[in-house]
């Protein structure tokens, strides 16, 4: 399997090269040359680690299958407490795919617990001996998951950049208290898009690359712009379908709709790959918060990033430039020149418009909707009071949009992307309780109000020493990269 750049299909690399490099030299994202077809029934009979290995080996063809099997078994075992890809009934034929039972209590663990193994093996496959500097822009969950996955990995240094004031306090503490000799964390003045743009500029700067190369260092990414982040996320769509099969809720071939809360479009794009591999995915419903740039695009074909930015109770979705949409545009248009022109227009003017036939092709699979802040709170309250189901703010966005897009007779799986205890103040307030300023007090009150127990990895943050408190401007990200001490 070869991988092409979305902006220049003549640039072809192996899976190992795509994972080591992260981003193509001209700024494009790597996409697979084809969609491998799998025996869905056979895959759905596997346990999660074996299922992951089966999907991974279809794309990572230059990796030893035995290595992939070992890596998947190590990743999705004890760290997920037997709940990898856990599907919970909510009400009727609506289900929650709980993706927050990993070490950092967010869906990013599925990729970022595995990705360090993939990177180290990719370098071995390629005979590469240089050090790797990983730069990560995060709106909350990716940062901690990447830090947890890469800390103390030999030959790797990782720097994470998050928007100051743009995460929950729990998310911030998860990053600020991270242990490891090869990690660094910076708050960036501005929003997530400012941090992400700053990181992308570093990747595109040939002078920085040359200076680092002189020190035997190469840049890479752990954001979902890296193929190694995206491919593990395909697996849990198969896992959800498999559980519905085993429960007798669907017969093989019956469609299942998925509603995904997303800002950067990576998690929902993984569902598109699963569909193209043969999984009977019906509709993929894109759920946005008040920063509803994706809703507008999927309805009109016009992408406008230059708009008001809102800080919401679902901060991991507070994004205006959705990087992974570029991959979908490539798959739908089949044209690298068209995608390159659209991305250039976005960079220059802050917007672009796709052709009507492109929008129509996208709308064959994708539906959309968004939730205002009061609707998010109302959804948290309704799911708890009516169904006894406790969810976080991002999942609540998806539940709201899922109800708008529910098709009679078709099961709906809502991707639950983070533990409700990551956002205890917002969840507590939504339940009509007084929400104290302190997140840990709120966590305790949420436990009392619901009878649920906060994950130990979150409750244990209380009182931990903060190691990182630097605040920088986006323009200083380049200096951070050049100052790394691998």
Language model segments and positions:
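PLP-dependent amino-acid enzyme catalytic core
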Residues: 1-486
């Amino acid at each position: 399997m070869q991988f092409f750049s979305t902006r220049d299909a003549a640039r072809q690399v192996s899976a190992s090269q795509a994972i080591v490099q992260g981003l193509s030299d001209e700024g494009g994202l790597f996409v697979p040359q084809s969609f491998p077809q799998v025996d869905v029934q056979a895959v759905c009979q596997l346990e999660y680690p074996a299922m992951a290995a089966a999907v991974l080996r279809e794309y990572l063809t230059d990796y030893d299958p035995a290595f992939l099997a070992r890596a998947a078994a190590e990743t999705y075992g004890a760290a997920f407490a037997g709940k990898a890809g856990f599907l919970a009934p909510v009400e009727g034929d609506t289900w929650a795919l709980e993706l927050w039972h990993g070490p950092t209590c967010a869906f990013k663990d599925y990729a970022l617990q595995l990705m360090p193994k993939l990177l180290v093996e990719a370098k071995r496959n390629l005979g590469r001996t240089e050090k790797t500097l990983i730069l990560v822009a995060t709106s909350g969950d990716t940062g901690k998951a990447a830090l947890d996955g890469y800390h103390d990995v030999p030959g790797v240094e990782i720097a994470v950049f998050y928007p100051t004031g743009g995460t929950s306090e729990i998310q911030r503490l998860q990053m600020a208290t991270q242990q490891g000799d090869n990690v660094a964390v910076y708050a960036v003045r501005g929003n997530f898009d400012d941090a992400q743009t700053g990181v992308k500029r570093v990747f595109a700067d040939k002078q920085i690359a040359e200076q680092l190369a002189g020190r035997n260092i190469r840049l890479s990414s752990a954001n979902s712009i890296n193929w190694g982040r995206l491919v593990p996320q395909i697996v849990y769509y198969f896992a959800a379908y498999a559980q519905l099969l085993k429960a007798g809720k669907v017969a093989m071939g019956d469609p299942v709709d998925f509603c995904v809360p997303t800002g950067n479009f990576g998690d929902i794009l993984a569902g598109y790959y699963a569909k193209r591999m043969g999984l009977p995915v019906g509709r993929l419903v894109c759920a946005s918060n008040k920063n509803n740039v994706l809703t507008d695009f999927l309805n009109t074909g016009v992408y406008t990033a230059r708009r008001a930015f809102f800080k919401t109770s679902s901060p991991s979705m507070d994004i205006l430039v959705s990087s992974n949409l570029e991959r979908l545009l490539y798959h739908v248009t089949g044209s690298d020149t068209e995608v390159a022109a659209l991305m250039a227009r976005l960079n220059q003017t802050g917007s672009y418009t796709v052709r009507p036939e492109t929008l129509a092709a996208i709308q064959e699979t994708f539906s959309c909707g968004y939730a205002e802040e009061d609707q998010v709170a109302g959804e948290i309250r309704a799911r708890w009071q009516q169904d006894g189901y406790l969810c976080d703010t991002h999942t609540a966005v998806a539940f709201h949009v899922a109800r708008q897009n529910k098709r009679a007779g078709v099961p709906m799986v809502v991707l639950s992307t983070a533990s409700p205890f990551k956002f205890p103040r917002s969840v507590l307030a939504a339940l009509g309780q007084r929400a104290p300023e302190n997140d840990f007090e709120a966590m305790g009150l949420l436990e009392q109000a619901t009878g649920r127990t906060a994950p130990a990895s979150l409750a244990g943050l209380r009182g931990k020493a903060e190691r990182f408190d630097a605040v920088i401007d986006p323009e200083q990200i380049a200096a951070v990269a050049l100052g790394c001490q691998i």
